[in-house]
Amino acid sequence: MMKGGMAGLMKQAQQMQEKMQKMQEELANAEVTGQSGGGLVSVVMTGRHDVKRVSIDQSLMSTDADDKEVLEDLIAAALNDAVRKIEQNSQDKMGSMTAGMQLPPGFKMPF
């Protein structure tokens, strides 16, 4: 390989690394909302999986033990929904960055 070709490859690799770092920061700061119970419970979470806010509809607030279990299940479901949305957002964004790469099916990037 000629000297100029290697320098070009190094420059491309550096540009790709910079784009990946920027994309990772955008993903980490992105906020998603997970919901359950038709919106009765919602959770706002960042790409870093930090929970920013939990909202519970007033209709779910009671002292009945059965309602408590339902509420716990709805909170767990909303959290899981938010995590799935973060994963999908990450796959979508990174997929557009790696579209030109010849990666094997199912290959996960280390981020």
Swiss-Prot record:
One of its GO terms (cellular component) is bacterial nucleoid. Its main location: cytoplasm. SUPFAM superfamilies: YbaB-like. Transmembrane segments: none annotated. Keywords: Cytoplasm, DNA-binding. Binds to DNA and alters its conformation. May be involved in regulation of gene expression, nucleoid organization and DNA protection. Residues 1-25, 89-111 are annotated as: Disordered. Gene3D superfamilies: Nucleoid-associated protein YbaB-like domain. The keyword DNA-binding applies. This is Nucleoid-associated protein PSEEN1789.
